[in-house]
Amino acid sequence: VIDGKGCRSGAVVERKKLSQWFFDISKFADNLQEELNNLDEWPNKVKIMQQNWIGKSFGCEIEFKIIGDPKIKKIKCYTTRPDTLFGFSFLAVSIDHLLSELYKNDKDFKKFKDECSKFGTTEESIANAEKIGFKTKLLAKNPLDEEKTVPVYFANFVLMDYGFGAVFGCPAHDQRDFDFAKKYKLEIKTVVKPINENDDFKVTNEAYPGPGIIINSDFLNGLEAPNKSIIETIKILEKKNIGKKTINYRLKDWGVSR
């Protein structure tokens, strides 16, 4: 897709709802993952490709309290890094999220949605596209510090069919979030430092997604990240009854209609 058009045909690329047939293969995600171990004659690189395609990940479901409209009280999201919540500076949702019903008559949102429909829908095309957002009037509370609120955006890089169609942004430790925060002048708070750095370490020119030690995070400070810090954060969220450990898959049902 180049400038909203197919690179070969020149046709305008649009996103539309269609009636389609699917094979319900997502039900067999665990079986597919386990059976890879029995494929002794398959090349290892092919099995790795299959593992990535299935995309099994361990993470956490988190509920974020929403203020600004009585019709929306909570938004749920899935994350593999709940331990970076103290670096949370925005909540982003898909243009197909239920929240979009509140903005269906908003002219500016319609323009934004039309603009998003011109982008490709593959992970590769979304990763390469400019990160754009539409700011709502809503605010999300940080579940670990409810005095802290952040803006809620619709964003072109959030897919409705992954997790719950919503992600929390931690710009200091995710490059996509970093680019988005720079564009919209959002806070970039460092909450993980490399092991050999001091506590005053700050992310400046690019995100730091690597391992290290939790900082600037109140009761999580000093924990080894990501392994110990993730486990401890999930325990805290489960105790508060606002989050729980869960498993997610990239694998989706197989569409067979064209």
Show the residue positions of the predicted features.
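Short glycine-rich loop/turn motifs
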Residues: 57-61, 89, 135-137
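Residue patterns forming the tRNA-binding/recognition surfaces of aminoacyl-tRNA synthetases
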Residues: 1-75, 166-258
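Conserved phosphate/anionic-ligand binding catalytic regions in large, soluble enzymes, centered on
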Residues: 74-97
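A short, sequence-level motif marking secondary-structure junctions
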Residues: 19-20, 79-84, 154-159, 220-221
